[in-house]
């Protein structure tokens, strides 16, 4: 549960995580980097789908 809260907070601050930030989060949360990367991708996709946008570029 704590991991999820941290990921959500990080996502709120920045939808695109940097490699350096991903590495440090992975260590802090005892996850591997690819798990964090995929979580961010899935979260962005879920938001895009929920907003009904056809073009992801319009999110910027």
Curated annotation (Swiss-Prot):
CC per GO annotation: nucleus
Main location: nucleus
InterPro entries: Engrailed_Homeobox_TFs, HD, HD_metazoa, Homeobox_CS, Homeodomain-like_sf, HTH_motif
Cited SUPFAM superfamilies: Homeodomain-like
SMART domains: HOX (SM00389)
Alphabetized Pfam families for the sequence: Homeodomain
GO MF terms held by the record: DNA-binding transcription factor activity, RNA polymerase II-specific; RNA polymerase II cis-regulatory region sequence-specific DNA binding
Function according to Swiss-Prot or TrEMBL: Required for proper formation of the apical ectodermal ridge and correct dorsal-ventral patterning in the limb.
Entry protein name: Homeobox protein engrailed-1-A
Organism: Xenopus laevis (African clawed frog)
Species lineage: Eukaryota, Metazoa, Chordata, Craniata, Vertebrata
């Amino acid at each position: 549960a704590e991991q999820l809260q941290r990921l959500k907070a990080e996502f709120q601050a920045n939808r695109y995580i940097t490699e350096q930030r991903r590495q440090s989060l992975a260590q802090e949360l005892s996850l591997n980097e690819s798990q964090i990367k995929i979580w961010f991708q899935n979260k962005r996709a879920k938001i895009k789908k929920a907003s009904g946008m056809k073009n992801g570029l319009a999110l910027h």
